[in-house]
């Protein structure tokens, strides 16, 4: 669990920075995904904005709750982790169905899909252990 804070900070601040960069068109052309300038792809990309910001809000809020010793930080963390998995899965599904493979975007979204699974497992395991006590 001690590494979860680092993963949350990297992911949540990363999402905020990504959306600020996207909003102000600061992402270099060479880093952009394929067809990033087509209206459909712009809409597809921005469809993730509410989800990604909700991930950041719930993740950062769970860290705050943990810092002030509120037990419900675990529930907020679990919500954030599940939403993060969904974000990565949705993006990878789209890239798969459109037969598009860009290593950088696949790595970012693979990270979003996979890293939360370890912490979801730990939170659920800890919850079961607490319930049995």
Swiss-Prot record:
CC per GO annotation: plasma membrane
**What is the topology of this protein in the membrane according to its UniProt annotation?**
Multi-pass membrane protein
Transmembrane annotation, as ranges: 5-27, 42-64, 77-99, 103-125
Alphabetically sorted, this entry's keywords are: Cell membrane, Membrane, Transmembrane, Transmembrane helix
What coarse category fits the chief subcellular location reported for this protein?
Answer: membrane
Subcellular compartments: Cell membrane
Record flagged with keyword Membrane: yes
InterPro entries from the UniProt entry: Uncharacterised_YvaD (IPR020348)
| The protein, known as | Uncharacterized protein YvaD
* Source species of the chain: Bacillus subtilis (strain 168)
């Amino acid at each position: 669990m001690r590494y979860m804070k680092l993963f949350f900070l990297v992911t949540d601040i990363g999402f905020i920075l990504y959306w600020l960069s996207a909003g102000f068109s600061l992402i270099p052309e060479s880093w952009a995904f394929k067809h990033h300038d087509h209206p459909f792809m712009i809409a597809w990309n921005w469809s993730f904005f509410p989800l990604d910001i909700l991930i950041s809000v719930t993740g950062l809020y769970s860290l705050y709750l943990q810092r002030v010793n509120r037990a419900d930080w675990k529930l907020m963390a679990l919500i954030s982790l599940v939403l993060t998995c969904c974000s990565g899965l949705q993006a990878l599904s789209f890239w798969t169905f459109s037969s598009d493979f860009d290593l950088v975007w696949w790595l970012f979204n693979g990270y979003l899909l996979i890293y939360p699974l370890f912490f979801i497992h730990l939170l659920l395991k800890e919850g079961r252990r607490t319930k049995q006590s």
